[in-house]
Regions:
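Solvent-exposed loop/turn segments at secondary-structure junctions
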Residues: 12-17, 50-55, 83, 88-94, ...
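Short beta-strand/loop segments at the ligand-binding rim of alpha/beta enzyme cores
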Residues: 2-9, 80-83, 145-150, 239-246, ...
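N-terminal carbohydrate-binding/catalytic regions of secreted carbohydrate-active enzymes
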Residues: 2-111, 265-279, 285-319
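Substrate-binding cleft of extracellular glycoside hydrolase catalytic domains
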Residues: 57-165, 170-190, 194
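Substrate-binding and catalytic surfaces of secreted/luminal carbohydrate-active proteins
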Residues: 49, 54, 60-63, 147, ...
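Receiver (REC) domain switch-region micro-motif
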Residues: 46, 117, 198
Length: 323
C-alpha cells in the first residue's frame, strides 16, 4: 500500500552499479556498497531510476529489466525498504503501447514494497507517447489501486516581479511547464485520469529572472522557487496540493549559480508539511557527499560543507511526523 506521504531520494541505478551482480550500489560513503547497506535507517524508501525502452521489454542502461528486478527486489523486501520504479529520465524515453505491456512491466517489480511507478518526462517524447502513457495509467491504476502513479515534470517558477519570496498569483497564475508538461496535463484531462500525482522537478531554472524563478540578490532562491512552482501548478492547472510532490536537485544545479542549500531543504519541507503535499524526493542519493562548488557532478554535491548523506538526513528529520 502506497503511504499517504512518500519521502524517497532518487537513486540513479547506473551510478556505481555492480555490473557483475546487477545489485544497485553506491559509492556515497567512499566505499562501493549495496545501496541498502548505506541507506540511513530513518529513510524507508528509494526511487529507482530509470527504466527506458518499451514497457515489458524495458532496460536499465542496458541491463534487462528482469535481471535488475531479480537482483534487487528480494533485497528490498528483505530489508523492508519501499521503492518506486521510475521510468524515462533525461537520457532516455519510456514508451508503452499496450496495457498488457504495462502489466508485464509492473508485475516484474511487484512486491509488498513496491509503492509507485514514476514517469519522468524529459527526453523529448512525442505527444502520442505521452497520451499512450496516460491511457495506460488509467487502466493500471484500476488494476493496482495501492500504487502511486506519478508524472515527474520539468518546471519553471515564474514569480511576481520584485518579490523575494514565493506568493500566489491566484487565477492569473502563469503556466510553469514546457510543452511536455502541458501535454501531460492535457492528456490527464482528456482521458479522465484521477489517481495520479505531479512531481515537480524544482531545479535548473535558467537565468535568474522573475520569469524563471524567485530572485533575491541576483540569484534564484531555490527553496522559494520550489514553493512558487507548486503554487503555480495549484493555481494554473488546479492540481490540489494533495496530488503534488517536489524534487529539488541538492547542492549545485546544472545551471551555474543555482545552489540548493540545507536551508532550502528546511524551507521546502516546511511548505510541504503545511500544505499537505504528498511527496518529497531529490536528485540524487549518490550526489549527497561533499565536493567543492563547481560544475554539477553525478557523484557529489558541488556545494561542500554539508557532510555525507547530509541532505538525505536533513529531509528525513524535517519531514518526520510531529516535527
Amino acid at each position: 500500500m502506497a503511504p499517504a506521504f512518500l519521502y524517497s531520494p532518487y537513486k540513479d541505478a547506473t551510478i556505481s552499479m555492480n555490473w557483475n551482480t546487477n545489485v544497485i550500489s553506491s559509492n556515497v560513503t567512499g566505499q562501493m556498497s549495496p545501496v541498502l547497506s548505506v541507506l540511513p535507517t530513518n529513510v524507508r524508501a528509494l526511487t529507482l531510476a530509470f527504466a527506458t525502452g518499451e514497457c515489458g521489454s524495458e532496460n536499465w542502461a542496458g541491463v534487462d529489466g528482469g535481471a535488475l528486478a531479480a537482483a534487487n527486489v528480494p533485497l528490498f523486501t528483505a530489508a523492508n525498504v519501499n521503492y518506486v520504479i521510475s521510468t524515462g529520465g533525461a537520457a532516455g524515453s519510456f514508451t508503452c503501447g499496450s496495457d498488457a505491456g504495462m502489466a508485464t512491466f509492473i508485475n516484474r517489480y511487484a512486491s509488498n514494497n513496491l509503492v509507485g511507478i514514476d514517469f519522468d518526462i524529459e527526453a523529448g517524447q512525442t505527444q502520442q507517447v505521452i497520451n499512450d502513457l496516460v491511457q495506460r495509467v488509467v487502466v493500471a491504476q484500476q488494476n493496482y489501486p495501492n500504487l502511486r502513479f506519478s508524472f515527474t515534470l520539468a518546471t519553471l517558477a515564474p514569480s511576481q516581479p520584485g518579490a523575494v519570496m514565493a506568493s500566489s498569483w491566484g487565477a492569473s497564475a502563469p503556466d510553469s511547464f514546457n510543452i511536455y508538461g502541458d501535454w501531460v496535463m492535457q492528456a490527464i484531462q482528456t482521458y479522465g485520469l484521477k489517481n495520479y500525482t505531479i512531481n515537480l522537478m524544482t531545479m535548473d531554472y535558467g537565468s535568474a529572472g522573475p520569469g524563471n524563478c524567485v530572485v533575491a540578490n541576483g540569484t534564484c532562491q531555490m527553496g522559494q522557487s520550489a514553493i512558487q512552482a507548486a503554487m503555480n501548478l495549484h493555481d494554473h492547472w488546479g492540481v490540489p496540493y494533495s496530488q503534488m510532490e517536489l524534487t529539488p536537485m541538492i547542492g549545485g544545479n546544472d545551471v551555474a549559480g543555482e545552489t540548493f542549500t540545507p536551508a532550502d531543504a528546511d524551507t521546502t519541507a516546511a511548505f510541504v508539511k503545511q500544505n499537505g503535499l504528498v511527496g518529497v524526493h531529490f536528485w540524487s542519493f549518490d550526489r549527497d557527499v561533499d565536493c567543492p562548488p563547481g560544475a554539477a557532478s553525478s557523484m557529489c554535491n558541488s556545494i561542500g560543507g554539508v557532510g555525507t548523506l547530509g541532505y538525505t538526513n536533513r529531509f528525513a528529520s524535517d519531514l518526520a511526523p510531529g516535527r
